[in-house]
Swiss-Prot record:
This is Two-component response regulator-like PRR73. Its main location: nucleus. Controls photoperiodic flowering response. Seems to be one of the component of the circadian clock. Expression of several members of the ARR-like family is controlled by circadian rhythm. The particular coordinated sequential expression of PRR73, PRR37, PRR95, PRR59 and PPR1 result to circadian waves that may be at the basis of the endogenous circadian clock. Induction: Expressed with a circadian rhythm showing a broad peak in the middle day. Belongs to the ARR-like family. GO terms for biological process: cytokinin-activated signaling pathway; phosphorelay signal transduction system; rhythmic process. Residues 82-200 form the Response regulatory domain.
Length: 767
């Protein structure tokens, strides 16, 4: 082959090669079609100085004529690629060497990394490509790769790593060190066929103009004896054409390398000369800094694109800035209200070094970022500290949007009424200081003097509740009251109905605090899940007055179903004539109206609670009763005591009642007003503190809780007994079979048939 090359390059016009059919005769030796195909591929892809592409006219003539004269320099390069194969396993090294030679490579085998490094230091070997194993004794493949990339001369040699361990950590480590590809064992033949492309890429990136490549201005030389003849054999026109093709192919290959590291001609090749190497290399690329990365191949290839196409990210960056302004507008409108720390928009806006824009307008957007951040902070702070003008609007808005958890203060809330006793100033001051965290629906907690209620939601002992009892609660007040109230926890028998004065104060009967059943530990608890009786109790100083909100003012009728969207309690059932009827039924109003606000909470569907009652069977006896001056109540089945009904009544929606501490209790009748599903009980405290209504304590939370525990214990004992009996039967059966098996004779581990007498004896023993 060498003689043919020398003769062909000295006298190209006379010395030719005759081709016969698909094979080519070279000095009497025939080349295989596979080698011819590989050489044709090399001729089309290798840069100038190696060969020139064949002319299409000659190809047509070759098809027409069996014998055609082909110039040797028109054919593919004379020299072959020399591959240094580094593999410590002998059999693998021999197999891969044979495959490489079959793919027309020259192979220099090496047993370990030190031997390979000695071969590389010998410049007479002229190694074009290194194919090395990752794990090797003495000097590993990664160590060899580091030595190659740090060497002054050998750093231009492409290094391909191969290993049977294809973990991402190993692959990424090799590629970040400067490897151009990673092959997973077992290696396929088509992967070895495409190894020349790495050499072509390295030569291609270094043979371009200096302005594009940045650092590689000299061409990749293949030091061999035949290189002089090769470089001088092409014509000037061919060289110019190749230069143009090189520039076009350079842009194409750069685009592919930026994406997946393979170009169109690679076929099955999956090259790893990609952005991952650039990202994890110790010296990262940036458009402002020259690319002098000795250990990264793709840095040489990607750098021109980062300079030429640096403006491609401008639309994206501007779009991102526009999106930031839109988010700021949304924040000002209240769509994205932040209670905690605001988002760090600078971290979101930060881009990678490759996506840094050179547009000054984008930098201007960057300077505006802290200002927008502070704007969002102030908006959030103003939203949190914004005083309300109407307390009723505040409460109803919180009730309508229970998902909104903003902190709202009522420091500047106007005084709702002038009818305020002088002795309540201390309560007013303590209530004004309360934040909305203390006045929220989900946490009612009042801090004040001993006469005030300490409302803490005690969520203990929730296991006996149904899934239907935990619903949203709507609280509203009449005529601008602070309107919080209502419902006591289902296991508190001594809880008091809340009363809101017109100046936003919450009070309760002080005597009720002395009656504790020990179920929750606190005398007054608010439960969001249960419904509330509209009950009014007076403070200890004014407890001698009889108050009926329905008889006092017609606009304050109580209703079992309180609409969520309304701010005041509507008269859903009863009109003014019903109020007069209630007054005629024996309500004595002897006190001027200084309490006009009742606590309303949203009542849910009654059939839910009936279903709860039938499932839990928590109240064995249900007594019929209602309180005096009942406005709009239909059939009342729960025993109300001082404005409270048992939480485990038919509806399952009312808080636990008193156990009869306040004097007389008598059943009374109430007009039936056409809504059988709504049941409301108003308990009124008269001058003597007597509670109107039936005072049976059948709905006691402790009794019901104990009943539920008893039911569970009984069911558990029954289950355990059944399991014990079942297991006992299994145990007896197992033991009898075991005893029979031990008695049966065996020969070599196999049972043998017994005689009839022995069988009869075994059966007698079983009996």
């Amino acid at each position: 082959m060498g003689s043919a090359c020398e003769a062909g390059t000295d006298e190209p016009s006379r010395d030719d090669v005759k081709g016969t059919g698909n094979g080519i005769l070279e000095n009497g030796h025939s080349h295989k079609p596979e080698e011819e195909e590989w050489r044709n591929g090399m001729g089309e892809d290798l840069p100038n100085g190696h060969s020139t592409p064949p002319e299409p006219q000659q190809t047509d003539e070759q098809k027409e004529h069996q014998v055609q004269i082909v110039r040797w320099e028109r054919f593919l390069p004379v020299k072959t690629l020399r591959v240094l194969l580094v593999e410590n396993d002998d059999s693998t090294r021999q197999v891969v060497s044979a495959l490489l030679r079959k793919c027309c490579y020259e192979v220099i085998p090496a047993e370990n990394g030190l031997h390979a490094w000695q071969c590389l230091e010998d410049l007479q070997n002229h190694i074009d490509l290194v194919l090395t194993e990752v794990v090797m004794p003495r000097l590993s493949g990664i160590g060899l790769l580091s030595k190659i990339t740090s060497h002054k001369i050998c750093k231009d040699i492409p290094v391909i790593m191969m290993s049977s361990n294809d973990s991402m950590g190993t692959v990424f480590k090799c590629l970040s060190k400067g490897a151009v590809d990673f092959l997973v064992k077992p290696i396929r033949k088509n992967e070895l066929k495409n190894l020349w492309q790495h050499v072509w890429r390295r030569c291609h990136s270094s043979s371009g103009s200096g302005s594009e490549s940045g650092i590689r201005t000299q061409k990749c030389t293949k030091p061999k004896v035949d290189d002089e003849y090769e470089n001088n054999s092409g014509s000037n026109n061919d060289n110019e054409d190749d230069d143009d093709n090189d520039e076009d192919d350079d842009d194409l290959s750069v685009g592919h390398n930026a994406r997946d590291g393979s170009d169109n001609g690679s076929g099955t090749q999956s090259s790893w000369t990609k952005r991952a190497v650039e990202i994890d290399s110790p010296q990262q690329m940036s458009p402002d800094q020259p690319s002098d990365l000795p250990d990264s191949t793709c840095a040489q290839v990607i750098h021109p694109t980062s300079e030429i196409c640096s403006n491609r990210w401008l639309p994206t960056a501007n779009k991102r800035s526009g999106k930031k302004h839109k988010e700021n507008n949304d924040d000002s409108m209240g769509k994205y209200l932040e209670i905690g720390a605001p988002r760090n928009s600078s971290m979101e806006y930060q881009s990678s070094p490759r996506e840094m824009s050179v547009n000054p307008t984008e930098k201007q957007h960057e300077t505006l970022m802290p200002q927008s951040k502070t704007t969002r902070e102030t908006d959030s702070r103003n939203t949190q500290n914004e005083p309300t003008t109407q307390t009723v609007d505040l409460i109803s808005s919180i009730a309508r949007s229970t998902d909104d958890k903003q902190v709202v203060r009522i420091n500047n809330a106007p005084d709702c009424s002038s009818k305020v006793p002088d002795g309540n100033d201390k309560n007013r001051d303590s209530l004004i200081d309360m934040t909305s965290e203390e006045l929220g629906l989900k946490r009612l907690k009042t801090t004040g003097s001993a006469t005030e209620i300490h409302d803490e939601r005690n969520i203990l002992k929730r296991s006996d509740l149904s899934a239907f009892t935990r619903y949203h609660t709507t609280v509203a007040s009449n005529q601008g009251g602070a309107g919080f109230g209502g419902s006591c926890s289902p296991q508190d028998n001594s809880s008091e109905a809340l009363k809101t004065d017109s100046n936003c104060k919450v009070k309760s009967n002080s005597d009720a605090a002395e009656i504790k059943q020990g179920s929750n530990g606190s005398s007054n608890n608010n439960d969001m899940g249960s419904s509330t009786k509209n009950a009014i109790t007076k403070p200890s100083s004014n407890r001698g007055k009889v108050i009926s909100p329905s008889a006092v003012k017609a606009t304050q009728h109580t209703s079992a179903f309180h609409p969520v969207q309304r701010q005041t309690s509507p008269a859903n059932v009863v009109g003014k004539d019903k109020v007069d009827e209630g007054i005629a039924n024996g309500v004595n109003v002897g006190h001027p109206v200084d309490v006009q606000n009742s606590f309303m909470q949203h009542h849910h569907h009654v059939h839910y609670y009936v279903h709860v009652m039938t499932q839990q069977q928590q109240q064995p006896s249900i007594e019929r009763g209602s309180s005096d001056a009942q406005c709009g109540s239909s059939n009342v089945f729960d025993p109300p005591i001082e404005g409270h009904a048992a939480n485990y009544s038919v509806n399952g929606s009312f808080s636990g009642g008193h156990n009869g501490n306040n004097g007389q209790r008598g059943p009374s009748t109430a007009p039936n007003v056409g809504r059988p599903n709504m049941e409301t009980v108003n308990g009124i405290v008269d001058e003597n503190g007597a509670g109107g209504g039936n005072g049976s304590g059948s709905g006691s939370g402790n009794d019901l809780y104990q009943n539920g525990v008893c039911y569970r214990e009984a069911a558990l004992n029954k289950f355990r007994q059944k399991r014990k009996v079942r297991n006992f039967g299994k145990k007896v059966r197992y033991q009898s079979r075991k005893r029979l098996a031990e008695q049966r004779p065996r020969i070599r581990g196999q049972f043998v048939r017994q005689s009839g007498q022995e069988d009869q004896a075994g059966q007698d023993e079983d009996r």
